[in-house]
């Protein structure tokens, strides 16, 4: 069933209403959190149209609101479970209905399988071994995003178009595994990383930019779902009042993102992706 199906939407609204009705807080207090619905929409639109996780929107905002680091990361993961899942399902249906029948994106599922497994291993290696993040990780990741954004704009505007790659070469499999292991670890620390790194690599290697985004979104969704148990069952730090409103907003944003991407040419999508990388980098560097 597609998430835009009226029956599914009715179920979602009903389920959300039940959660509010049984929430251990007064309706008056909960109303104060409705503004986070917009944050969920915004984060999911950028996340699911570029492949970079919504945490790049959520974490800076949560830091400004005085969340603890654990609360910010856990709440970001929880919201992304809504938004990235909506985006992943939307991209999956796009592949099944429009790409697979034409024989396009032959590497779609193989890349997702390998990358998701490696990413989850990297993420749970951090949790299982209790690995602390490098002190300069966030700052370095921000510079990396900024410079890569500039590089992708150069590729899109200056270099002549070349034929797209359809098949994954042995060196690509090696790089995808390494990038995904590292990206999973970074995601454990920052709640973002795997989608951005994977999309960047696939775009640079001249795979279809829409496929790069779709793969990154789906791998990100699988990664955040594997992570949420650490922040709920093991060590609960989710700011649930925020998720109660930002989560449904993120679902809407995740669906809307695909419609936005459909309006962009491959070149414009690359530029949009690069612009978002530079925004991420600039915000991180200025806050570093």
Identify the residue ranges that each predicted region occupies.
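Juxtamembrane transmembrane-helix boundary motif
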Residues: 1-40, 63-65, 69-71, 88-184, ...
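Transmembrane alpha-helix interface/packing and boundary motifs in multi-pass membrane proteins
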Residues: 40-51, 180-191
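Membrane-helix interface "capping/anchor" motifs
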Residues: 45-55, 205-214, 262-267
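Transmembrane helix boundary and interhelical junction motifs in multipass membrane proteins
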Residues: 50-58, 190-199
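Interfacial segments of multi-pass membrane proteins
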Residues: 58-71, 197-211
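Membrane-interface alpha-helices at helix entry/exit sites of multi-pass transporters
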Residues: 68-78, 101-107, 206-218
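Membrane-embedded alpha-helical segments of transport systems
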Residues: 77-87, 113-121, 125, 218-226
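A small-residue-rich subset of transmembrane alpha-helices
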Residues: 79-81, 217-232, 241-250
């Amino acid at each position: 069933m597609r998430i835009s199906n009226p029956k599914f939407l009715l179920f979602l609204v009903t389920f959300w209403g039940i959660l509010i009705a049984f929430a251990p807080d007064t309706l008056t207090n909960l109303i104060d959190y409705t503004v986070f619905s917009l944050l969920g929409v915004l984060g999911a639109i950028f996340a699911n149209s570029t492949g970079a996780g919504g945490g790049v929107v959520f974490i800076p905002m949560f830091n400004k609101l005085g969340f603890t680091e654990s609360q910010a990361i856990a709440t970001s993961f929880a919201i992304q479970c809504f938004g990235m899942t909506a985006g992943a399902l939307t991209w999956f249906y796009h592949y099944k209905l429009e790409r697979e029948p034409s024989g396009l994106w032959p590497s779609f599922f193989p890349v997702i399988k390998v990358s998701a497994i490696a990413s989850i291993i990297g993420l749970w290696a951090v949790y299982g071994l209790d690995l602390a993040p490098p002190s300069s990780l966030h700052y370095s990741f921000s510079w990396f995003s900024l410079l890569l954004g500039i590089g992708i704009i150069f590729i899109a505007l200056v270099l002549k178009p070349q034929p797209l790659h359809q098949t994954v070469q042995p060196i690509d499999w090696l790089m995808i595994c390494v990038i995904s292991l590292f990206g999973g670890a970074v995601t454990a620390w920052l709640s973002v990383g795997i989608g951005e790194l994977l999309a960047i690599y696939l775009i640079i290697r001249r795979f279809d930019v829409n496929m790069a985004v779709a793969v990154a979104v789906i791998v990100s969704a699988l990664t955040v779902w594997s992570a949420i148990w650490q922040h709920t069952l093991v060590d609960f730090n989710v700011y649930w009042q925020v998720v109660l409103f930002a989560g449904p907003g993120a679902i809407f944003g995740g669906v809307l993102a695909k419609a936005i991407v459909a309006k962009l040419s491959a070149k414009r999508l690359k530029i949009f992706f690069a612009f978002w990388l530079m925004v991420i980098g600039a915000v991180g560097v200025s806050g570093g």
